[in-house]
Swiss-Prot record:
GO molecular function: all-trans-retinol 13,14-reductase activity
Membrane topology type: Peripheral membrane protein
Similarity remark: Belongs to the carotenoid/retinoid oxidoreductase family. CrtISO subfamily.
Catalytic activity: all-trans-13,14-dihydroretinol + A = all-trans-retinol + AH2
A Pfam family this chain is assigned to: Amino_oxidase
Organism taxonomic ancestry: Eukaryota, Metazoa, Chordata, Craniata, Vertebrata
EC code(s) of this entry: 1.3.99.23
InterPro entries assigned to the protein according to its UniProt record, in alphabetical order: Amino_oxidase, FAD/NAD-bd_sf, Retinol_saturase
Gene source species: Danio rerio (Zebrafish)
Keywords: Endoplasmic reticulum, FAD, Flavoprotein, Lipid metabolism, Membrane, NAD, NADP, Oxidoreductase, Signal
Subcellular location: Endoplasmic reticulum membrane
Protein name: All-trans-retinol 13,14-reductase
Signal sequence region: 1-22
Protein purpose: Catalyzes the saturation of all-trans-retinol to all-trans-13,14-dihydroretinol. In addition, saturates the 7-8 double bond of all-trans-retinol to produce all-trans-7,8-dihydroretinol. Can also use vitamin A2 (all-trans-3,4-didehydroretinol) as a substrate, to produce all-trans-13,14-dihydro-3,4-didehydroretinol or all-trans-7,8-dihydro-3,4-didehydroretinol. May play a role in vitamin A metabolism.
Cofactor section: NAD(+); NADP(+); FAD
Length: 607
């Protein structure tokens, strides 16, 4: 007994020294923002940064780390290490860097694939400060309209549209106008979201604490009592909302944003939901110049420290020594393997790809790895539709906002029926359609692509519906596959043109990306939108104490959304967590500290 107490005490002391006092280099030691430089719109110039192909001769010597995957989790950890002088190589299997932050161009239209809107980017907010430091202050943001989201419920003949405003008071006041008599429910919902969301630090704590202490907190149940976030983690969004109100439309409106983390309300943790509600409570933004601006401004920081970001570099395995320690990666170049050695290997490829594809079979069977895999499931897959339009946003009635379209307010039942149906029938009754205009959100669009506009649509779609065509050539899949895509496109377009009637005769381009499209371009094993599943089990104390940046393989680390949470901000948080472990310093606290110093400095300038 006493031995255990002493061991836990010593582990706690070590933790406090490592993550509170801070012993390693600090990438947030100084404010690295620079004066804004002119934006670059020339695609050839941008491609020189974003599309640097892999060659053995381009691999820097004496690497400090190699990162698999160039999504925001991979680029961010590379930038953090580069800022303290580390030489990092980032390897991307696609032909351009950025992961879900990349864009593509078809018939003169540019489409983003994953960045729709981001919250918490007011000046001096910690997230804004982190991104400013990651891009040396070169990434600019355009605010969305207020209201930024529109929730559409019901068929055309009985349609109700509820608008979601930013600003806590405005958000509540506008909802109360729509739902008289429900003031108490709305007040309690907003209060709960704030209280629960503020306790998210417990997730980070469990990943940082020494394993004996974390396990002690889990076994004794103390971890579930630390914050409201812990206490509500096992409660579904449906249960919490249903306790607040009997009004079915209000229930749907309070739940509408579940699509941004990919779980239907009855399967979603209220703790996860509270984070998203708080994330957008004070507004939403879109990257000025499009999503490629993110990677475009991060890569030079990696290169300045001697590193590189190389594309068309499919990593086929992680190299291990005889002691089963990671010592580098193997890249397939044609039929040959190129070995890249580094003392640290960081995977932004997702936990399933990392453990089930990149590690040897005998290592995959390690109990510690199997335990982690048993705790997770693949997330839900999705369908994206890309629409190119002839006309300006003014001519077509497009705004910098989003629409969430539901055929009725019984969301759980609609989605369960949709997911359990056969693919042809389900294509005709899509229960959730997210639609937005990236071109209307980007203030540089009229200069870059005059007279044209775009819409992007996202919805759920089962991987199994498309799985039979996964081995077809990407640009030459079968006629049956194309016909199924057309079926989904046609029925979804009906709903979209009801919201945007002016686009009916102005569509010049339309195509869809299915789960197997995601599988090919972003290496999502089952076409997942948000990596590992974000349902209730994802938020258990045991899982968060078990899945850490440091994997069971020495020198192999995880970064990105599978380590922490989904989405841009979640993957970025995963990079901070990974960097904290590698650099022996709590980068979450350091980022908050720098944000405070920058804010105080600006306040002094004003006075």
């Amino acid at each position: 007994m006493w031995f255990a107490v002493v061991a836990i005490f010593l582990a706690l002391v070590a933790f406090l020294y490592r993550y509170v006092v801070g012993s390693g280099p600090n990438p947030f030691a100084i404010d690295t923002r620079e004066p804004l430089k002119p934006m670059v719109f020339d695609r050839k110039l941008k491609n020189k940064v974003l599309k640097q192909g892999f060659l053995a001769s381009r691999v820097p010597e004496d690497l400090d780390a190699v990162v698999v995957g160039s999504g925001i989790g991979g680029l961010a950890i590379a930038v953090l290490l580069a800022k303290v002088g580390k030489k990092v190589l980032v390897l991307e299997q696609h032909d351009r860097a950025g992961g879900c932050c990349h864009t593509f161009k078809e018939q003169g239209f540019e489409f983003d694939v994953g960045i729709h809107y981001i919250g918490e980017l007011s000046n001096h907010k910690p997230l804004r400060c982190i991104i400013d430091q990651m891009t040396n202050g070169q990434l600019q943001w355009d605010p969305l309209e207020n209201p930024f989201d529109n929730v559409v419920i019901g068929p055309p003949e009985n349609r109700r549209i509820y608008q979601i405003y930013s600003g806590r008071k405005r958000y509540m006041d506008e909802l109360k106008k729509c739902f008289p008599g429900e003031e108490k429910a709305i007040d309690e919902y907003v209060r709960l979201c704030k209280e629960v969301g503020q306790g998210v630090w417990v997730m980070v704590l469990l990943k940082f604490l020494p394993t004996p202490i974390a396990n002690f907190l889990v076994r004794t149940g103390l971890a579930n009592r630390l914050t409201s976030f812990s206490r509500y983690a096992s409660r579904s969004l449906t249960d919490v909302v249903n306790e607040l109100t009997q009004n079915k439309d209000l229930r749907a409106v309070l739940s509408y944003i579940f699509g941004t983390y990919g779980k239907i309300p009855k399967e979603a943790s209220f703790s996860m939901h509270s984070l998203i509600v708080n994330h957008y409570m004070n507004g939403a933004w879109y990257p000025k110049g499009g999503a490629t601006e993110i990677a475009y401004h991060m890569i030079p920081i990696i290169e300045k420290a001697g590193g590189a970001v190389l594309v068309r570099a499919p990593v086929n395995r992680i190299l291990l020594n005889d002691a089963k320690e990671a010592i580098g990666v193997s890249v397939l170049k044609g039929q040959e393997e190129v070995h890249v050695r580094a003392p640290i290997v960081i995977s932004d490829a997702g936990i399933f790809n990392t453990y089930e594809y990149l590690l040897p079979k005998d290592v995959q069977t390690m109990p510690a790895i199997q335990k982690q895999l048993s705790m997770l499931q693949h997330g839900d897959s999705g369908l994206s539709i890309f629409i190119g339009l002839d006309g300006t946003k003014e001519e077509l009635g497009l705004k910098a906002d989003n629409y969430f379209i539901y055929p009725e307010n019984n969301i759980d039942e609609l989605l369960e029926d949709y997911r359990s149906g056969n693919r042809e029938e389900s294509a005709k009754k899509n229960p959730l359609i997210f639609v937005a205009s990236p071109s209307a959100k980007d203030s540089t669009w009229p200069e870059r692509t005059p007279g044209k506009s775009t819409l992007t649509v996202v919805s759920f779609a089962n991987y199994e519906w498309f799985e039979e065509w996964k081995d077809d050539k990407v640009k030459n899949r079968s006629t049956d596959y194309k016909q199924l895509k057309e079926l989904f496109i046609n029925y979804i377009l009906e709903a979209v043109t009801e919201i945007y009637p002016k686009i009916k005769d102005r569509i010049e381009y339309v195509d869809a990306g299915t789960p197997i499209t995601n599988q090919h371009y972003i290496a999502a094993p089952r076409g997942e939108i948000y990596g590992a599943d974000h349902g209730i089990p994802r938020f258990s104390a045991e899982l968060n104490a078990t899945i850490r940046a440091q994997t069971p393989i020495k020198n192999l680390y995880l970064t990105g959304q599978d380590l922490m949470l989904c989405g841009f901000a979640g993957a970025l948080t995963g990079a901070l967590t990974c960097g904290s472990v590698i650099l022996n310093r709590n980068l979450h606290l350091e980022a908050f500290s720098l944000a405070k110093r920058v804010q105080n400095g600006n306040n002094k300038k004003k006075t």
